[in-house]
Amino acid sequence: MELADILDRAHVVALPMAVPFRGITTREALLIEGPAGWGEFAPFVEYGDEESAAWLRAGLEAAYQGYQGIDLGDRAVRINGTVPAVAASEVEGVLERFPGVGTFKIKVAEKGQTLIDDISRIAAVHTHRPDAELRVDANGGWSVEEAVQAATALADAAGGMLRYIEQPCKTVEELAEVRRRIDVPVAADESIRKAADPYRVAELDAADVAVAKVAPLGGVGNTLTIAKDLAAHNMSITVASALDTAVGIGVGLIVAKAVEMSMVGVTVNAAGLGTQRLFVEDVVEKQELRGGCLDAAPCVPDADRLAALAAPGERKDFWFDRLRRCWDILDVAGGSYDVPYG
């Protein structure tokens, strides 16, 4: 595997968002057409190179190794719908993008908004989908006291359907304190994928749920290993994406099904892999939801869509430069991409 070969195989795309997500209106990604399949490199633009190198590692694993030999069973993966931090009046339109889905993740603690906004959004979701299970994601946006206050208010707004609060605070220590003080289960996301030690959440009994995202954890092999280890500490598992294109979603679906098939006795929650429905266009046609499920299968982008969604030249240069820097980090680290599954 050589850098020049990777760049020759790369396509940079810009996908317009139907609904803004964390302030993003266009999602950019670098896709790699490798000998074993397609990989994705799309760390958010504010991420530094050290953190972003794990995303490159995951993309190279998909493109150059592939995932043959993983038991996918019937391939059906239950997903959750995702509701960005929209006004309550916009909730119904977002929900319509997820027919048949029985679980929704709702963004809260958005900068510039208040707890009242969050309560209204969650109440609107519950009104339109009263039988749906709900989870909220604060992305570390609260203090401990704010999280404790919010937990009660949001549980009430959810009408008894709130299943967990994801990453209420930034630090693992704060998560542990919040978990001790509230009745709603706590999920860890950033405290796993952005941490030097992803197992600290288990050591401090800081979470009931582990959110596992393939790209920031460095690939399928690493993700399955971390998920298995955290499940051994009585944590349930939610496999999720980081606003991936269909390429990354395809890999996430494979991991979600692999977790379900290989970890007997582990509670596997509906996967956070439905965000493709927040795009206006993607590199393939949106996969049809069947019974609230998507099929686990690798994605092969459509050539016409790749061309139509190609990013402008200066953005291609930005992503190529970023890939080069992250490649240097991986190369210095040893450049090993052979990771066993499980």
Question: For the regions a protein language model found, what residue spans apply to each?
Answer:
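N-terminal capping/lid subdomain adjacent to the active-site entrance of alpha/beta enzymes
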Residues: M1-R135, N139-A158, V283-G342
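Shared catalytic-loop signature of beta/alpha-barrel
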Residues: Y199, E203-L306
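Active-site-adjacent beta->alpha loops and helix N-cap segments on the catalytic face
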Residues: E110-H128, W142-E146, P168-R180, A195-D197, ...
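Catalytic beta/alpha-barrel core
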Residues: F104-T114, E133-G140, G160-T171, V184-K194, ...
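Glycine-enriched alpha-helix->loop->beta-strand junction motifs that scaffold or abut catalytic
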Residues: F98-G102, H128-D131, T152-L162, R179-A187, ...
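Conserved, mostly hydrophobic/aromatic
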Residues: I32-G34, F104, D137, I165, ...
